[in-house]
């Protein structure tokens, strides 16, 4: 994965696209003009500009102005098993030690991230408003990062779920307008890229043909549900009991059949790879290795597996040799440290 400044990335992509002929205009759309029931004729802008098009990409965020508000795309909420619906964010300065990784740390009613960038550290606390107020969540984050009085925090509301059909008529919803799964696995950009690539492929094959459109919508929906299952498992398998938030997550039985199948397979010694491939027609979002890491990482082993003695004759890891090899590889790269002022 990469650490990047989302604002600067947007500027870079804008410049990259315009240099290659993409027309970039800053206009405020105030209304949507419909043609047929399931198609858009034009966007009407504040300055009187009327923008016609063959395909309209709805990137209007959680408002989903075209897909949901105009075309009536159905929204499917995920609140029954993904409780978090808020985030409080607050950047901080680098400490003396510069970390080359994102930290994800459990909190009383959710979890927080710490992401090092070259000029600052991004911090955020993802939580459920059912279990903690905005004020208390901000106070908890400030205490955790040692910024009780510095900086201005922002509260972000999250609408967690997806629309039933990402491609409706001549509108493609992308980003927050098509759906959002909380950022625990940082999957938002992946879904946007997959949506763009799959749409281009489907459109080139069949234009507005309903067959290709239906298959595209099914693939995107399956991707959302596959990611959802994996993230829900993080909460369902937790073994904390210090707050009601974590107790309710551990007791939550609103699980999909696929997730129940993966948990059952793990505890009954089935082949996770076979089960995973079968559930997703050979194309799962998370490989079986990821599921192994998740289950084992939570220490959720079948009871008998905990008492089985370690087999003899196993090859022991040559830790010192591995450490020397990695150190030698590191000499090929610049030292990972913040840019000097």
Pin down the residues of each PLM region:
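Long, low-complexity C-terminal extensions of enzymes
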Residues: 201-341
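Short conserved micro-motifs at the rims of enzyme active sites and ligand-binding pockets
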Residues: 100-101, 126, 183-186, 305-306
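A residue-identity detector for tryptophan
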Residues: 16, 111-113, 167, 246, ...
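Generic, low-specificity signal for short hydrophobic/alpha-helical stretches with a mild N-terminal bias
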Residues: 96, 123, 153-159, 174-181, ...
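Predominantly flavin-linked oxidoreductase catalytic cores and closely associated redox partners
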Residues: 1-143, 196
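Tryptophan-centric aromatic hotspots in well-structured domains and transmembrane helices
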Residues: 2, 55, 111, 167, ...
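Short, surface-exposed, charged/polar-biased interaction segments
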Residues: 34, 77-78, 83, 109, ...
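FAD/FMN-dependent oxidoreductases across multiple families
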Residues: 118, 127-239
